[in-house]
């Protein structure tokens, strides 16, 4: 089960927080700070998995850094670490396709669309969809027509994504 999903910038400012388990808001704020501190202090050569007891007993923090953003999933021991890393990759690629070179400002100003894309991937702490084309299609169908017309074609997206990361 996925307990929470976070996106932080490199200064520790949360750009997306989604908890799939009920936790008091004061505890949520402490968890966000603790998770960012644990992830941001690790050297780039370190493994992207951390053992943790922060949420619901024993769990794992799985993260990946893209440019100035940390994408963090907190999961139970039953989830595959490599599967979650792939899920993070799919989520980032979906964001990149939907927002034409996604950046931190997209996360700030288009947070509803970001949450909608995340809801296509994860719901209630369970993975719903991993097919990138299905996720992008569902997300684009939810966006207003003006935003959809600005979406980048599929062939250009992968090449721009590969050069950015």
Swiss-Prot record:
Belongs to the adaptor complexes small subunit family. One of its GO terms (biological process) is intracellular protein transport. It comes from Schizosaccharomyces pombe (strain 972 / ATCC 24843) (Fission yeast). SUPFAM superfamilies: SNARE-like. This is AP-3 complex subunit sigma. InterPro entries: AP_complex_ssu, AP_mu_sigma_su, Clathrin_sm-chain_CS, Longin-like_dom_sf. Keywords: Cytoplasmic vesicle, Golgi apparatus, Membrane, Protein transport, Transport. Pfam families: Clat_adaptor_s. One of its GO terms (cellular component) is intracellular membrane-bounded organelle. It is found in: Golgi apparatus; Cytoplasmic vesicle membrane. PROSITE patterns: CLAT_ADAPTOR_S. The gene is aps3. The lineage of its organism: Eukaryota, Fungi, Dikarya, Ascomycota, Taphrinomycotina. Its main location: Golgi. Transmembrane segments: none annotated. The keyword Ribonucleoprotein does not apply. Adaptor protein complex 3 (AP-3) is a heterotetramer composed of 2 large adaptins (apl5 and apl6), a medium adaptin (apm3) and a small adaptin (aps3).
